[in-house]
Regions:
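Short intrinsically disordered, low-complexity coil segments enriched in acidic
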Residues: 1-6, 35-42, 87-89
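Glycine-rich FAD pyrophosphate-binding loop
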Residues: 1-16, 148-161
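FAD-binding core/adjacent interface of flavoenzyme oxidoreductases
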Residues: 6, 13-23, 50-132
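Conserved N-terminal glycine-rich FAD pyrophosphate-binding loop of Rossmann-like flavoproteins
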Residues: 11-32, 160-166
Length: 166
């Protein structure tokens, strides 16, 4: 047999892309438009994400991966603690995922300023939207709200949008 594997995930299996990035934005792009039904669109996004997440969880369990719904803390060269329990391992791989980065701009703590995670967790029509960051998620979110009729401005420090793409 192979190695035994445990996956510590305090949020949701699938990470940023599945839960708060690529997948929800693609589902939004598919359904957004003038006069779109935002509650129905939000329900469809959740249905798509939940279905794919359940599929990932099923695949992981079928492969023998133990899913542990806690944040892990490495406490030694071969020890991880999570949820009040200690786990021993010959090898520890840290794949910490990502969070939206906040640039050092005064005023980002003002009410109404949200990260992409916040925007995706509160889907609703907007008249105007300023997006700081012209990466993939920023551009996709801009397209969603523009398609729904919002006036959208993207602010990007690089000379062009999508600066990490060729």
């Amino acid at each position: 047999g192979g190695l035994s594997v445990a996956l510590f995930e305090p949020r949701q299996v699938g990470g940023t892309c599945l839960n708060r990035g690529c997948v929800p934005t693609k589902a939004l792009l598919h359904g957004a438009g003038p006069g779109c039904d935002w509650p129905a669109l939000a329900a469809e996004v959740e249905r798509v994400v939940s279905t794919l997440r359940a599929g990932q969880e099923k695949q992981l369990r079928a492969a023998g991966v133990e899913l542990i719904p806690y944040r892990a803390v490495v406490t030694g060269p071969h020890t991880v603690e999570a949820g009040g329990a200690a786990y021993e391992a010959a090898h520890i791989l840290v794949a910490a995922g990502s969070e939206p980065a906040l640039p050092p701009i005064p005023g980002l703590d003002t009410p109404g300023v949200v990260t992409s995670d916040g925007l995706l967790s509160d889907l609703r029509p907007l008249d105007r939207l300023a997006i700081i960051g012209g990466g993939v998620i920023g551009v996709e979110l801009a397209c969603v709200w523009a398609a729904a009729g919002a006036r959208v401005t993207i602010l990007e420090a690089a000379p062009r949008l999508l600066p990490t793409l060729e």
